[in-house]
Amino acid sequence: MLKISKLIRLVAAAIMVSGHALFAGNVPESNDPIKVTIQDWTGQHFSTHVAAGLLKEMGYNVEIVVSDAITQHPAIASGNINLSTEVWTNNVGDLYDGLVDKGDIVVVGELGLSPKEGWIYPPYMEERCPGLPDYKALYECAQAFGSAETFPKGRLITYPASWGTRSRDMVASIEMPFEPIPGGSEGAMVAELKSALSAEEPVIMMFWQPHWIFASYDFNWVEWNPTDGKCVEESQQKETACGFEQAKVQKVVSKGFEDKWPAAFKMFKAMTLTNADENAAILEVDEKGRKVEEVAAEWIAENKSIWQNWMD
């Protein structure tokens, strides 16, 4: 009986080994490169390089393709891009929902981030603008946030132009006396915040979490009216303004991805990252000057116990 049991265990082990070998032998299912989009903020750079690194670990050819938050969608729908780690659903433009409905873009799931977006300002601005954090206070003290180029209106730093016009749309909709000025890039926006803080100068800016800056500096968020429905920036009114629709961060692939690269699809569907993961990575890159590829490779090396389960 012991010999039979041992034989059964050996046979079972052999089947498991041969099964893993068969799986490994079938990957990559195609030698065509998986084209992964990289965009223009550090957190997305990190999630992109983690996904790309894991795909390479599995044996896939990977090509990184530059796009942005809006232009990625037609590129994914046409198959010129195959995978995006971060689609922020409140900043997708007019095409995205229709392309998803048609099946040209496939939503794999959420990445795992808990995002927040809105206007931030340093706490010392509450002395210069009594009534903050309530957004209505900004109507009375816009000049406190003004500059030579915007006076008597306040100066509002918004997202870079390629990220959409949500702040501009809302300012126009609720007739707030601010001049929206697009930030040049994430790095330029962070530099402006740090410069303003060091001199206690006025600043108000559209920003987002996760981001390392909230672990290093104090900021308050402008508060808006709660809403039970969808918060649409361009159709708000002064008395009932709800601010900004908060995002889900979705992982998406091109049509036919699962059929062409099934093991890659399985891994990507299981892949998750947290705010803590991205905050730590952004700090290493933006503050310590490390290369994002190096930081992503380090995360992969230190977290095999996590990502190995995504591939099994």
Model regions and ranges:
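Immediate post-signal peptide segment of exported/extracytoplasmic ligand-binding proteins
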Residues: F23-K35, G146-K153, I306-D312
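Short, well-ordered beta-strand elements
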Residues: E29-G43, Y60-V65, K153-I157, F268
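Short helix-initiation/N-cap motifs at beta->coil->alpha
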Residues: Q39-T42, Y60-A77, I181-E192
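Short, polar/charged alpha-helical segment
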Residues: T42-N61, V171
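Pocket-flanking alpha-helical
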Residues: T48, S67-G103, E192, W212-S216
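Ligand-binding pocket segment of bilobal, Venus flytrap-like solute-binding proteins
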Residues: I81-T85, I157-E233
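A conserved helix-loop-strand patch within extracytoplasmic ligand-binding domains
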Residues: D104-Y159
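A bilobed periplasmic-binding-protein/Venus flytrap-type ligand-binding module shared by bacterial periplasmic
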Residues: K116-R128, Q246-K260, L283-E284
